[in-house]
Amino acid sequence: MKFSLLSAIAAAVFVPFTSATPLASTADLSYDTHYDDPSLPLSGVTCSDGDNGMITKGYNTAGEIPNYPHVGGAFTVETWNSPNCGKCYKVTYNAKTIFLTAIDHSNSGFNIAKKSMDVLTNGRAEELGRIKVTYEEVASSLCGLK
């Protein structure tokens, strides 16, 4: 009896932590208006060229990225030619969600176009400045990328 009870308790505690469903994480999010410029040359961002670069993927300006203006810097893009260049993130704030394409480095969390932060905050990006969001990496197709 003791063994069955202990096994049941262990299973109840362990099973939720082994779920295949990805868990969302939290991060800071801020904006930078230079990402709002559709003519922003991708030659000037961390994810410029190289095997993982956005130019190599066929995009020369921010406005050419399919889900523009939902672009910006991500803390996951640490250096030039990072394997995280072009990754798509589902970013949520107060039940509003955008799908963000990482094109640059951010020192802390995400740093995105003001237009995108306005979508998340109902036009309050400038007022709020920095917010806490939940995020998870998702399929690049959700950002319109192949």
UniProtKB/Swiss-Prot annotation:
This is Heat-stable 19 kDa antigen. It comes from the Eukaryota. Glycosylated. The keyword Secreted applies. Belongs to the cerato-platanin family. GO terms for cellular component: extracellular region. It comes from Coccidioides posadasii (strain RMSCC 757 / Silveira) (Valley fever fungus). The keyword Glycoprotein applies. Residues 1-20 form the signal peptide. It is found in: Secreted. CDD domains: DPBB_CEPL-like. InterPro entries: Cerato-platanin (IPR010829), RlpA-like_sf (IPR036908). Its main location: secreted. Keywords: Glycoprotein, Secreted, Signal.
